[in-house]
A protein has these predicted regions:
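Gly/Trp-centered helix-boundary motif
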Residues: 1-155, 159, 163, 289, ...
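Alpha-helical transmembrane segments of integral membrane proteins
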Residues: 125-345
Length: 345
């Protein structure tokens, strides 16, 4: 695929912003690693060699009786000392770097939970004896995936709504504007509290609920671009030739409107991550037990005598938001028309 000179120039401007460029690399590497969280932090071995046979517990479930007739035909608990002793007597196991999952309760702690950082638990444990590092890894992945999904879907809905408003104008635009004014005034948090009293919000339920309100963030920007673009000469020429409205909007106006829209996406993503963390902190987010950065912040607040909880939550969440903001600033500079050759100052 051949890139246009303008696109190549924008990429060069983005790369010239070292802070944003390296922030993108760091964020991409961290997120890429978190996608393989089960291979990094898990209470199941990566690989087992037992009695001449190979087992991959991280990918497949095995019953305990597969490792000896003395065990019951139930799911293998690899944290059980007896099972581990039996396996190691006739073979060996390879464990992940962090031998705990986000739900694992650490056994045989030397101090009551929350326990401080140690060689066994690098970031300590929370008030339920769960490894903090494991919950951070899974919580980071969950927060980014949730924020990314919410950002993409809400942006798509917002672009469509703004495009319809700006392109058709008139009564269509007026009705949309009045609806947005009324809908944006709805008490989102109170509605979420009511919803939480009826059902337990899961990942998708919470995502759909927030989508009902988050789509309005980009509508005004897209609407303004379509209001401007629909009166341009090449758009009028396309209409005169009988090109359908959908084709005109998709091929002739939307590419220009997306330039302004793309600069908002990193900031929208950071806002989505912050929103999920805030709801989890207040107790209105994901179900209890889910790996969440906001829940870790709440634990830090409730356990002031365990400062590692608050510090970990602060630095992880602050670091994620800082990286996204730096990326957003670099994207904004790259799409700034004043930075392109021939642009008037």
């Amino acid at each position: 695929m051949t890139l246009s000179p303008v696109t190549r120039r924008r990429i060069a401007i983005f790369q010239a912003n070292k802070r944003g460029f390296w922030s993108l690399w760091i964020f991409a590497v961290l997120f890429g690693l978190s996608l393989f969280a089960e291979f990094i932090a898990n209470d199941r071995p990566l690989l087992i060699r037992f009695d001449g046979h190979w087992y991959v517990p991280v990918l497949q479930d095995y019953s305990e009786d597969a490792f000896g007739a003395d065990f019951l035909p139930t799911g293998a608990d690899y944290t059980d000392p007896e099972l581990r002793k039996t396996i190691e007597a006739k073979g060996w196991m390879i464990w992940p770097l962090v031998p705990f999952s986000y739900t694992t309760s650490v056994k045989d702690l030397k101090v009551p939970s929350p326990a401080p950082p140690s060689w066994r638990n690098w970031l300590g444990t929370d008030d339920q004896a769960r490894d903090v590092l494991a919950r951070v890894i899974y919580g980071f992945r969950l927060s980014v995936l949730f924020g990314f999904t919410l950002t993409v879907v809400s942006s798509a809905v917002g672009v469509i709504a703004g495009a319809v408003q700006g392109y058709y104008g008139g009564m269509t635009d007026l009705l949309f504007q009045r609806f947005i004014e009324v809908w944006s005034g709805m008490p989102e948090l109170y509605l979420l509290i009511i919803l939480g009293s009826i059902i337990t919000p899961g990942f998708w339920v919470l995502l759909i609920f927030l989508l009902l309100f988050r789509w309005m963030s980009l509508t005004g920007v897209v609407r303004a671009e379509f209001l401007r673009g629909r009166n341009l000469d090449y758009v009028r020429a396309a209409k005169a030739l009988g090109v359908s409205d959908v084709i005109v909007m998709w091929r002739h106006i939307l590419p220009n409107a997306m330039v302004a829209t793309l600069t908002y996406l990193p900031f929208t993503l950071s806002g989505s991550v912050t929103l999920l963390s805030t709801l989890d902190f207040l107790g209105f987010g994901l179900p209890p037990g889910s790996p969440s950065l906001g829940e870790l912040v709440a634990q830090g607040k409730s356990n002031l005598t365990a400062p590692w909880l608050g510090f970990t939550a602060f630095f992880v969440l602050g670091g994620v938001l800082m990286l996204l903001i730096f990326i957003g600033e670099a994207v904004r500079d790259a799409f700034d028309p004043r930075r392109l050759p021939g642009a008037s100052s």
